[in-house]
Regions:
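Extended acidic/polar regulatory tracts at the flanks of large eukaryotic scaffold/adaptor proteins
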Residues: 1-152
Length: 152
């Protein structure tokens, strides 16, 4: 519960430019924020992704802080490949489609907020290496299955 309250406080502070600038200038805090994506609680994971996305779209400093935070996440969680946890969230059968949608929104923000073409290519290559194309195809099939269940 404390974790949720802290995320709510961070979210409130990001409602203005001063709060965004303050957080973007503190990559160590952004790294801790990213670790919340490793939570078992879907709400906490979603909140963490939303806050990281706000930082990414604000500008270069926030974007670099989020990339560093994702590298920190990889290191702390012992992942072999950067962004593996994002792929894992898309591939798991336990997560619902709404959460997977939020993960995809974060991934799109990550790719589209890159500062230059080389960085965008590198991020896309990392995501493709993790198996994102298979995950997206699987997600499309799940979406169709859910739609068909609701229609029938």
């Amino acid at each position: 519960q404390l974790q949720v309250e802290l995320l709510k406080c961070l979210k409130a502070s990001l409602n203005n430019q001063l709060g965004i600038d303050f957080l973007a200038a503190r990559p160590e805090v952004v790294g801790i924020l990213a670790l919340n994506f490793g939570s078992e609680d879907v709400f906490i994971c979603t909140q963490a992704l939303e806050l990281l996305a706000v930082l990414m779209v604000d500008g270069p400093e926030g974007y670099r802080a989020v990339l560093a935070a994702m590298d920190y996440f990889k290191l702390v969680k012992g992942e072999r490949v950067r962004f593996y946890s994002l792929l894992d969230a898309l591939m798991t059968d336990e997560a619902d489609l709404a959460f997977k949608r939020d993960v995809m929104l974060f991934i799109n923000t990550l790719v589209n907020s890159a500062m230059d073409i080389e960085e965008r290519i590198e991020i896309r290559a990392d995501l493709i290496y993790t198996g994102i194309l298979d995950a997206v195809e699987r997600l499309k099939n799940q979406s169709v299955d859910v739609f068909m269940e609701k229609v029938s």
